[in-house]
Amino acid sequence: MINDSGSEEQIEDMSYMFSHCNSLTSLNLSNFNTQNVINMSFMFNNCTSLISLDLSNFNTQNVTNIRNMFNNCTSLISLNLSNFNSKNVKYMSNLFYNCSSLISLNLSNFNTQTVKFKSNIFYNCNSLFFKFLKIINNN
C-alpha cells in the first residue's frame, strides 16, 4: 500500500481485505508486498466468483493466521501456493472450507509443524483429488 507521502507502508494485517468481493473473477497480486504481514485470515472469504489465483510470489514468512483465508470460494478452480511459507502459521482452520470447485492446488512447500488449530481445512472440497507422491514416516 502507498501512503499519502508516496512511500510504501508496512502492512501487518490483510484479514478480510477482499472478503465478499462477489464479482471478483481474477486478481493479479504478483507485486503485492506481504513481507510484514502477520494475519491473512478471511482474506478472500466469500469471493464466490473467483476462479483462479496465483499467490506464489507472496512472502509469508511472518504470517501466523490463515484461517478461513479461502472460505466459501465456491468457483475457485486453481490455486497456486507453491512458495507459501507456512512455518510460522498457528491458525489454519477452515482454510479451504467449501471450495467445492477446487481441482488444482499446489501446497508443495506447506509446513504444518507449528499449526495449533487446523480443523476442517478441506471441508467440502469435493472436487479436489488428493495425490500423495511421497509419504514420510518420522517415527
Give names to the regions the model predicted.
Residues 1-139:
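Negatively charged
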